[in-house]
Amino acid sequence: MLDARYLRENLETVEARLKTRGAGVDLERFRQLDGSRRELLQQTETLKALRNKVSDEISRIKDKSQAQDRIIEMREVSQRIKGLDEELKGVEEALEYFLLTVPNIPCAATPVGASEVDNVEVKKWGEKPVFDFAPKPHWEIGESLDILDFERGAKLAGARFTLYKGFGARLERALINFMLDLHTERHKYLEMLPPFMVNRESMTGTGQLPKFEEDLFHMEGVDYFLIPTAEVPVTNIHRGEILKAADLPLCYTAYTPCFRKEAGSYGKDTRGLIRQHQFNKVELVKFVHPAHSYNELDKLLDNAEEVLRLLGLPYRVVDLCTADIGFSAARTYDIEVWLPGQDCYREISSCSNFEDFQARRASIRFREDEKAKPEFVHTLNGSGLAVGRTLVAILENYQEADGSVSIPGALRPYMGGIEKIA
């Protein structure tokens, strides 16, 4: 959420910055609501001051019969105040809802662009594998090795669901454990295991609500949502809290399944694991001091990249342009892994700095010391990594001519020493 005061004082600047997102934000609506709110507040305060003054005068009159006209007048003033308070409440609710639908302002360093074609590649790592045969896509490899069953997944739940079998299930589990061990033991994140369902306040805190409710799985009969990412419950761990500056940064990692409707992806990635309604992910979340948030973003990005480096998977990092960053983000780097079976790079992680946007929505603050005024923290998060897509990358990059798949060395201890799936 943007700061209403900052928006009021920098309306033209904010409007210009939001236009670079391609976001149609009606800031005239803000002017109207904010103006109405301030006018109603002034009227209410004036009447309350009058009521207090006259009430004091009445209290000094010994013969109350001489004050009946003033008493009747103040009753009328009280009714007017009550009506103004009710009107003010409605305006404030409308203003808050409006602010909840306004996206974050891109940071000054975010590349300006009109679409994903304007994203900027900032680095590459690793050599693409060279095959002496035509590399297959992961869905063919998974089916031929009998480790992925798309047909039965669809039978069980419908389109965009997959049944992992045997070494497929074991490889998925191995990747989860490998990622969590790396982030907790080497990168020093604290592991969390949050609920996989959250309430409306949590979804609002991270920015999924109120604007994107149609993309979420909502539980009928109870106001719970299946989480689209661990970012939601983990960020909301400190909702409504005031942290100590000395404790920052707080770095958390969590494995969860994620649930997404993929409402806008009809006809896209209909085969394989790339776009599923349910998938596993290991998430990285940081609560940081505003002065250090972009340094912490660089560290978080490197932590996510290290998963791919240790697995020997070629990748590139892309700085997303203003039109491609998410609703809550001020800056985002995507990590894209090379998939030879599809002859392209595909996103496997998004690492974002939200600055104080989520913290303001969720009221997550910190104090420099006991006497200091609370300030909003900056929140960061990134995938470390999307597990299913990492499995996809292993199947496609480590496939052999005979149809088998080699296991990356770093993963073999998690696979009971198995070197190859055949």
From Swiss-Prot:
One cellular component (GO) term of this entry: cytoplasm
GO BP annotation list: selenocysteine biosynthetic process; seryl-tRNA aminoacylation
Organism: Geotalea uraniireducens (strain Rf4)
Family: Belongs to the class-II aminoacyl-tRNA synthetase family. Type-1 seryl-tRNA synthetase subfamily.
Enzyme class: ligase
Binding site for L-serine: T229, A230, E231, E283, S383
Binding-site residues, ATP: R260, K261, E262, E347, I348, S349, S350
InterPro entries listed in its UniProt record: aa-tRNA-synt_IIb (IPR002314), aa-tRNA-synth_II (IPR006195), aa-tRNA-synth_II/BPL/LPL (IPR045864), Ser-tRNA-ligase_type_1 (IPR002317), Ser-tRNA-synth_1_N (IPR015866), SerRS_1_N_sf (IPR042103), SerRS_core (IPR033729), tRNA-bd_arm (IPR010978)
Gene: serS
Subcellular compartments: Cytoplasm
Gene3D superfamilies, per database record: Bira Bifunctional Protein, Domain 2, Serine-tRNA synthetase, tRNA binding domain
Any Pfam family the entry gives: Seryl_tRNA_N
CDD domains, A to Z: SerRS_core (cd00770)
Predominant place of localization: cytoplasm
Catalysed reactions listed for this entry: tRNA(Ser) + L-serine + ATP = L-seryl-tRNA(Ser) + AMP + diphosphate + H(+); tRNA(Sec) + L-serine + ATP = L-seryl-tRNA(Sec) + AMP + diphosphate + H(+)
Descriptive protein name: Serine--tRNA ligase
